[in-house]
């Protein structure tokens, strides 16, 4: 069965680059009826954070990326790793190295003085003597010293490494017995049945070491896909200064998971000229073999555009649920659906939508001085006062309100522009809002009259 995985280290919160990798792995597995598993690579016990693990799972839940089975923790699998280290030792494919840190530092200094690449010199590779007393050895794999390691990457094509240029007998277990990253990854990927490994191309240099271990252990090699990094707008590696990188920050900033996933899937992959991809679209069209070889560029303007699209088009019930996170339950209002629908057309984020909603739900405490100076004078104040007095205290539809208002203005030889902005200022405190008639239907005539009275009192 086609099986992919996402295997983060819990040393920090999940960033957007990691989420993109997880999304690609998820899509490929789900499209092909395969399995997608989550593995936490927490062998670095000093740097692990339980908060980071919680944040990763929270981000997956928010984005709707479900994984199969239980989460696998490497820290609970040390006994398994030790079995395979013993197997390699017993078969003569790995060995104990008693070289001290002082000796290793001296070797590196001598190599650097000769302008040679620092590497282990293999002095214990074929050692048969008596081990030095009082030294806990590391375990090293017997790596090929010559020749090449080649594989076909699903994105980059044919990849070749010269063993003499990049390899030495690298460590697979430290002196305290803990296994190293590359060793754990190979054991886990093999035992978990991972058939396709999709990961960032910062892992490309690990691949020859992992291939050596796969072959030494007799495991089948998965297909590798090394995805190019995401760059900031200035061409440098994406970092905090280019915008938020922690996935859950995007939720707090008012971005929808549908928009974020759509944004991320397009950072390195495309299908024709299409920009909008629902999850069903992604599952239909995505293929990791189509991922671009070159780095992609993070563009917040594009994310804003996508987010605005989803705010406009998602069903009311869906958006109302999302808005609860921001403290507004639109279902609690008689005209909640009308209110949300009147605001969604002009909102790029849910934070903007929240602020706009609060400007309508709550009576204004202050008024935009520039708007007041521009749109309200003695004549408009009288018109507002007369308009409020002319309204009956009963709730009416936006269409009826518009008809009543137009009739009121025509009797006085006035136009809608003569009163629209003063009404808007009375309702929201500013000259910006959706249709005033939709807003009046939401708040009701009684509240409208109260807000007009409050504005006039403030201006007197």
From Swiss-Prot:
Gene3D superfamilies: 1.10.10.350, HUPs
Placement of sequence motif 'KMSKS' region: 237-241
Protein name: Glutamate--tRNA ligase 2
The protein's enzyme class: ligase
Subunit structure: Monomer.
Record organism: Campylobacter fetus subsp. fetus (strain 82-40)
Classification lineage: Bacteria, Pseudomonadati, Campylobacterota, Epsilonproteobacteria, Campylobacterales
Main localisation: cytoplasm
Biological function: Catalyzes the attachment of glutamate to tRNA(Glu) in a two-step reaction: glutamate is first activated by ATP to form Glu-AMP and then transferred to the acceptor end of tRNA(Glu).
Motif ('HIGH' region): 8-18
UniProt KW keywords: Aminoacyl-tRNA synthetase, ATP-binding, Cytoplasm, Ligase, Nucleotide-binding, Protein biosynthesis
Family listed: Belongs to the class-I aminoacyl-tRNA synthetase family. Glutamate--tRNA ligase type 1 subfamily.
